[in-house]
């Protein structure tokens, strides 16, 4: 469950992304939510519902949203579906969710987002600790110039519940690989 600090961090991070020059100019917001299927069903359902409730209570922008849900099962299998924000808030979209093992890299995720979700003005990623990066150059090419600025990652177990922008995650995973 998201505590008050995590909710405030989410609201602040989303405001920063939406107010990047040239990103969101009003109207219907198109956004993407990526779920790492290595996470437990209980965590995903609860966090996604909290996320939707927090955003909806924060701003009128989230009253009418085109929401793309991406289930990141493994590098070779990413499932896309369009759902309503209310459906996410009630966690109904996770009734058939199954936790899955498999290799998940930022390489595959960033390539998929660049191809299919570049129009989204906001990309939220619920990620597990097992997310890795194989080719930093390829990830950088996929994240630049826009994906890195409009994507926010929340890693399960993040101590302060802070959301990291995509370009910061890219640097973090590169440092982790060097160790």
Region annotations inferred by a language model:
Residues 75-124, 130-136, 155-165:
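Von Willebrand factor
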Residues 23-24, 58-61, 113-118, 143:
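Surface-exposed acidic, glycine-flexible loop patches that form ligand/cofactor-binding
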Residues 1-32, 37-47, 63:
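Acidic, polar low-complexity linker/tail segments
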Residues 43-44, 134-138:
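Active-site-proximal, acidic helix/loop segment immediately C-terminal to a metal-coordinating Asp/Glu
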Residues 139-146:
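Mature extracellular/periplasmic domains of secretome proteins
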Residues 29-33, 65-69, 119-127, 148-157:
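Hydrophobic beta-strand segments of well-ordered beta-sheets in folded domains
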Residues 163-179:
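P/S/T/G-enriched low-complexity
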Residues 47-70:
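An active-site-proximal "capping" alpha-helix that borders the catalytic cofactor pocket
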